Amino acid sequence: MAKKVLIVEDDKFLRELISQKLLKEGYDIAETVDGEKGLETVKKEKPDLVLLDLILPGINGFDVLTKIKEDPSLAQIPVIILSNLGQKDDIERGLKLGAVDYLIKAHFTPGEIIAKVKSVIG
């Protein structure tokens, strides 16, 4: 059975680009464009991994991550943050809240993002 990745990203171009690459690699994909829908989808679909933007409409990615990690039925789901926020404080906060990795969008190609996903969930 294919592993499912949830992409929570409001940038349509980036979301679709990553989705297409993950689909080509054999992953199932779910997509949402805001924090609330992202959290609902995590609860409903229990994906194998979440790619999470931080600056989102509605509740931000830090809050989504906190809620995922506080819920015992979701806490084991790995979350990779994918954000333009590159300040040391933001990175440390994301990792401290439980993200398995923090990728700054400008520093990673879509191919490298897919490689990170593979390294976490195979």
Language model: regions and residue ranges:
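Short hydrophobic/Thr-rich beta-strand motif most characteristic of the beta2 strand and flanking loop
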Residues: 26-33, 41
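Acidic catalytic/metal-coordinating carboxylates
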Residues: 34-37, 60-66
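The feature encodes the CheY-like receiver
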Residues: 15, 57, 66, 75, ...
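Charged docking surfaces used in two-component/phosphorelay signaling
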Residues: 16-24
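Active-site residues of response regulator receiver
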Residues: 53, 83
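Conserved acidic carboxylate
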Residues: 9
